[in-house]
Each structure stands twice: as C-alpha cells, then as structure tokens.
Amino acid sequence: MKLHELKPAPGSRRPKTRVGRGIAAGKGKTAGRGTKGQKARSKVRPGFEGGQNPLYLRLGRMRGFKNPFKIVYEVVNVGRLNELPYEGVITPDVLRSFRLVRENGAPVKILGDGDVTRPLHVQAHAFSESARQKILAAGGTVEVIS
C-alpha cells in the first residue's frame, strides 16, 4: 500500500446535503426552514436580539483611545511618609520594603494629603506641588529621580 492508495473507511464520509434542489432530493421546497417567518426568509442580521434593545445600543458608544505611553504612578501621601519609622533618605525601594507601594517597578509619585511634622528627605519620580511645599516647609528635601 502506498500513500496515494489511502482511502477513508467505507461509510465514514457522507456527502454534504444540498438543500433547495427539488422535492425529490428530500430537502427541496422550504429547504429545512419550515414555513414563513423571519428565519424562513433570509438571515437575522448580526446583533439582532429579537426586538429587544441590542447589546451595542445598551452599552453606548465607546469614544477615545487608550494611550499606550501613559505613565501610571504608584502614589503615596506625605501623611503616610510622616508616620514611617525611618530616619534616612526615603526612596522608592524603602517604600517597597515598608509595603507602601507595590513591587511592580512602577514609578512613585508623592501626593500632598496629610501633615508633615518632621524633616523628610524624599527621593521619588514625581511630586505634587502641595507635597513639595509641605516637605520643604518642614525642613526636608525633595529630589526628583528618573
């Protein structure tokens, strides 16, 4: 036996039924669609839900786009920094070790909610203006790192 002599087993392959090819063919006249009605005539259009308000109308239009270059910061408020039991320079690695930011390597931004009662020496990727003012007013230092 050679490769070109291979054939499927007898009875394992049936020819496709050709509908609408005369009454004698067994699937003539209505071609298995029954009589009358929307589904007997043509196709129901894509997205049609039987008269119910379809999903694409219920959701409304989505506008705009997602900026693939958007920088998403891990944020920490100065009030949390003030509570840290740490005296050295506060860096993103220090914040990760205290579990104030996640371990995902995202840049860290310091925001200005809370009070600063002691001089803080902070290094971060970004600062809000209110956070910068509060840290400097308490005698601390602010350094933007890249």
Curated annotation (Swiss-Prot):
Gene Ontology MF annotations: rRNA binding; structural constituent of ribosome
Assembly notes: Part of the 50S ribosomal subunit.
Extent of Gly residues compositional bias: 23-35
Residue segments, region Disordered: 1-51
GO biological process: translation
Lineage: superkingdom: Bacteria
Functional summary from the UniProt entry: Binds to the 23S rRNA.
InterPro entries linked to this entry: Ribosomal_uL15, Ribosomal_uL15/eL18, Ribosomal_uL15/eL18_sf, Ribosomal_uL15_bac-type, Ribosomal_uL15_CS
Keyword annotations of the record: Ribonucleoprotein, Ribosomal protein, RNA-binding, rRNA-binding
Designated name of the protein: Large ribosomal subunit protein uL15
Family: Belongs to the universal ribosomal protein uL15 family.
Cystine pairs: none
Transmembrane segments: none
GO cellular component: cytosolic large ribosomal subunit
HAMAP family referenced in this protein's UniProt entry, alphabetically: Ribosomal_uL15 (MF_01341)
